[in-house]
Amino acid sequence: MNPAPNLVMIGPMGAGKSSIGRRIAKHFNLHFADTDHAIVERAGTSISTIFKYSGEPEFRRLEREVLYDLLNHENRLIATGGGTILDPENRHRMQKRGFVVFLKINVNTQLERLAHDRYRPLLQQIDRKQVLSDLYATRQPLYQKIADMIVTTDHMSPNTATAQLILDLTAHWQKSSNTA
């Protein structure tokens, strides 16, 4: 099994961190946690409301608190928000307390998957493709830098991506335990 205390899913919005993460957590008998859901619970309001009335800095502060709390436990699969990796301390903490899986997706697939999403604050723009392209350019190198494993989820259903990730994780952990 995973030699790290937790399994951490990173990647852009629409990559499948939550939907695939729930399935992976169930398969490996891990407690599932979603940082965005935990932020909403802690703040008592929606992410859109936090962005609108308190701004992105306050949202990122809450995100950091929630992430630290979740990482202080073990045997969790933590699905992070797409921007969690922007904070250098978050990146350090995720690497220290988890096996980090980057669910990679291209901008066109993101657009398809998020076409009807009207709740994400960063997508409340006229040119969604440009917003996603800009986010991709900024965040992609950070995702890759801290990832222990990269899985591309383009053109994969959640079930297919889950099955592939289970195979990849199992093979990686078996290989790691054989070389330890």
From Swiss-Prot:
One GO term (biological process): amino acid biosynthetic process
Enzyme Commission no: 2.7.1.71
InterPro entries assigned: P-loop_NTPase, Shikimate/glucono_kinase, Shikimate_kinase/TSH1, Shikimate_kinase_CS
UniProt keyword terms in alphabetical order: Amino-acid biosynthesis, Aromatic amino acid biosynthesis, ATP-binding, Cytoplasm, Kinase, Magnesium, Metal-binding, Nucleotide-binding, Transferase
Known catalytic reactions: shikimate + ATP = 3-phosphoshikimate + ADP + H(+)
Annotated compartments: Cytoplasm
Listed Gene3D superfamilies: P-loop containing nucleotide triphosphate hydrolases
Residues annotated to bind Mg(2+): 18
Pathway membership, UniProt: Metabolic intermediate biosynthesis; chorismate biosynthesis; chorismate from D-erythrose 4-phosphate and phosphoenolpyruvate: step 5/7
Main location: cytoplasm
UniProt KW Signal keyword: no
Cofactor(s) essential for the protein: Mg(2+)
Catalytic EC class: transferase
Co-factor binding details: Binds 1 Mg(2+) ion per subunit.
Recorded family membership: Belongs to the shikimate kinase family.
Reported function: Catalyzes the specific phosphorylation of the 3-hydroxyl group of shikimic acid using ATP as a cosubstrate.
Protein name (Swiss-Prot/TrEMBL): Shikimate kinase
Species per Swiss-Prot/TrEMBL record: Xylella fastidiosa (strain Temecula1 / ATCC 700964)
